[in-house]
């Protein structure tokens, strides 16, 4: 039945000459892990999609994935060092203060899944955390950015921008983007 419906939409849009893609999309809390949507290709609109001209891959930006290439890093591993970073509340501030590229910084964002489960998501500093992908990675129904009060309950008097993956409570689940795997001597 699904294939018949998909074919019907595909045939209609093809017949009228619409430049379109069937894309991988988020089905939301009620719809399972993913769904397929038909999207017209346009310079305007409410959605951003990633697609390939060489294949039939297409997804909305929340569901898009890239091909991860593991790299052999020849950088010499330095000793871990504690550095005071006063008044650096953003990735941009930290990169400027330490004179490093944003891609060398680990960005950590704390979420609360299903109302009470702390999740720490980690990406490169020049990337953004995708809440939908975090929700799907931990199998949660709902996810939201942790409030200041929730952060204080878990970590004490640590500002949100200073929470990181070191010495965490076992109750915190850590989810990291694959690109973090290639990072050496990160901040």
Predicted regions and their residues:
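Extended, low-hydrophobicity, polar/charged segments
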Residues: 1-187
């Amino acid at each position: 039945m699904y294939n018949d419906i998909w074919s019907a939409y595909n045939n209609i849009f093809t017949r009228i000459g619409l430049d379109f893609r069937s894309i991988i999309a988020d089905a939301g809390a009620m719809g399972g892990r993913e769904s397929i949507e038909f999207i017209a290709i346009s310079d305007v609109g409410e959605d951003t999609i990633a697609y390939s001209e060489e294949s039939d891959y297409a997804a909305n930006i929340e569901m898009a994935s890239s091909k991860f290439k593991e790299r052999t890093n020849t950088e010499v591993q330095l000793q871990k060092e504690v550095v005071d970073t006063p008044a650096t509340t953003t990735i941009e501030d930290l990169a400027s203060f330490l004179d490093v590229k944003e891609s060398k910084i680990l960005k950590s964002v704390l979420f609360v899944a299903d109302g009470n489960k702390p999740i720490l998501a980690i990406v490169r500093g020049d990337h953004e955390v995708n809440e939908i992908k975090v929700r799907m990675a931990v199998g949660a129904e709902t996810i939201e950015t942790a409030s200041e009060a929730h952060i204080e309950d878990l970590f004490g008097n640590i500002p949100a921008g200073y929470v990181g993956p070191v010495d965490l409570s076992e109750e915190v689940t850590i989810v990291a983007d694959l690109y973090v795997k290639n990072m050496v001597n990160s901040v």
